Curated annotation (Swiss-Prot):
Swiss-Prot/TrEMBL keywords: FAD, Flavoprotein, Monooxygenase, NADP, Oxidoreductase
Domain of life: Eukaryota
Binding residues annotated for FAD, in chain numbering: 17-22
Protein name: Flavin-containing monooxygenase FMO GS-OX-like 4
Family: Belongs to the FMO family.
Species of origin: Arabidopsis thaliana
Transit peptide is among the record's keywords: no
One annotated Gene Ontology cellular component of this protein: plant-type vacuole
UniProt GO molecular function: flavin adenine dinucleotide binding; N,N-dimethylaniline monooxygenase activity; NADP binding
Amino acid sequence: MAPSLSPIRSHHVAVIGAGAAGLVAARELRREGHSVVVFERQKQVGGTWIYTDHIEPDPLSVDPTRSVVHSSVYGSLRTNLPRECMGYRDFPFVIRSDVSESRDPRRFPSHGEVLAYLQDFAKEFAIEEMIRFDTAVVKVAPAAEEGSGKWRIESTEKEKKVLRDEIYDAVVVCNGHYIEPRHAEIPGISSWPGKEMHSHNYRIPEPFRDQVVVLIGNSASADDISRDIARVAKEVHVACRSNAADTYIERPGYSNLWMHSMIESVHEDGSVVFQNGKTISVDVIMHCTGYKYHFPFLETNGNVTVDDNRVGPLYKDVFSPAFAPWLSFVGIPWKVVPFPMFELQSKWIAGVLSGRIPLPSKEDMMMEIKTLYSTLDAQGIAKRYTHQMGISQFEYNSWLASQCGCSETEEWRKEMYFATGVKKRAHPETYRDEWDDHHLVSQAYQDFSLYT
């Protein structure tokens, strides 16, 4: 569908969050001519990439009254995609000649380098002038009394503690999904005497010195943290429900790190029994089981819900048909190259709001969503995987690009993504520091020369 030639309309738009999604959303909205206010509860840009030593007092992060820490970054974290692949399309993630030499030049850099990149992006495009820092959004709800499509936002500034009530034409939700942890269900856990925690509260390995630790999960964090802890722990065991029931493998290169099938049960004597029949005495169980989508501020009278981590109904993972185009989300899909996708989603939202890009009718959007849900059900795919994309992300990106009238994802970026996945599976210990895709890097830098 080609962009229409309708007159451009400007709207007053609120963006919730100043992480990687919120920053590019703000830029694209302003480029399209909209008036933008970004709400950010922290004192700087960067969202989930802001590292802090602080952890929550509740190691499982289940206490609703807890003081929430808005970062899940651990000290040793490095990207699992190369920087060339990660960056926004017109602001390459390259070593910049005009910044400090203390920056991390590696292709798979630290979390600090990603944060610095986002700060550079915000500075380059003067985004901070649109941001209200230290401001928490406590309520987003339709403001029917103000006219169709209007939204009421209530927010509080950290120091003032005064509720601010404002009306906006549209809201773009960019608050991320790495704050509210998911947990595995473990038979017998209520009487197990050891320590339970979620990886949200992991920072450094030292607290686990000489301990026996079980991690649950097969995510990038489980992989990274298990190897991190193995440097100091007595034993590390990784349990994963996707592993065959008889799985028991010593991790190559380690004498104290094993892969298992899922936990079968835990007991009062401190033991953990795996589906493979192995029983060990354990000090700590760490849930590396991901996060829930969480929008505690959003009131939609049931029109947008989170059901087993399916956010919906959403058209193309972005627009709520009930409120389109006045309520949208950036950054819902996972297992993707995030920043370039955020950029395309933001361009689409900005163009739709201005009237330049048409949306289908509410009925047609709902029909497509119902068809998607039926297809997933027929394939036996659980609701919690609704937003997992993987290989399908590039078809999705192509569709977004066609709506926006911009170029599709570069071939080198696609190839780099797939090559990195192959390398990671074959060489999980070394893929970040040994690579053979120099021809793709060369192609990337040819493209980057247009912007740097």
